[in-house]
């Protein structure tokens, strides 16, 4: 079993609050203050979960620089109070950065939710890779 430190537990909570504020900001017609606060909490929580060095190593890999620039550029534009454009840039950057994790997530969701229609939908979204590791 992998031991989780107290900092990682705090990071999970902060990341959860960040996602909540981002979703709540979208729900309230792209409220720029909530989106900016959610972005800052999300990035802070992510760096607490995996550490600063691994966060920088993840975001600044050579093949992920395009996604990183769109994601962090979107965060900056949201902070400058252009929420719709910033969230569009962030969404593209997020998909570009985390596209390698999507088959794993869809595979987990397909096995976690054993509902016939949803499991077949997640299996189609998962693609050819069925490995959970």
UniProtKB/Swiss-Prot annotation:
One of its GO terms (cellular component) is trans-Golgi network. The keyword Magnesium does not apply. Residues 31, 90-92 are lumenal. The chain crosses the membrane at residues 10-30, 32-52, 69-89, 93-113. One of its GO terms (biological process) is retrograde transport, endosome to Golgi. It is found in: Golgi apparatus membrane. Its main location: Golgi. This is Vesicle transport protein GOT1A. It is a multi-pass membrane protein. Belongs to the GOT1 family. May be involved in fusion of ER-derived transport vesicles with the Golgi complex. Disulfide bonds: none annotated. It comes from Mus musculus. Residues 1-9, 53-68, 114-133 are cytoplasmic. The gene is Golt1a. Keywords: Golgi apparatus, Membrane, Protein transport, Transmembrane, Transmembrane helix, Transport.
């Amino acid at each position: 079993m992998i031991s989780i430190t107290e900092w990682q537990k705090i990071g999970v909570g902060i990341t959860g609050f960040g996602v909540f504020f981002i979703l709540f900001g979208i729900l309230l017609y792209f409220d720029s203050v909530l989106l900016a606060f959610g972005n800052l909490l999300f990035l802070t929580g992510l760096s607490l979960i995996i550490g600063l060095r691994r966060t920088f190593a993840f975001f600044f890999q050579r093949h992920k620089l395009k996604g990183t620039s769109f994601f962090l550029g979107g965060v900056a534009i949201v902070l400058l109070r252009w929420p719709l454009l910033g969230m569009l840039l962030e969404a593209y950057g997020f998909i570009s950065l985390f596209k390698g994790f999507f088959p794993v997530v869809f595979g987990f969701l397909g096995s976690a939710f054993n509902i016939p229609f949803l499991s077949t939908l997640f299996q189609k979204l998962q693609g050819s890779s069925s490995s959970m590791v």
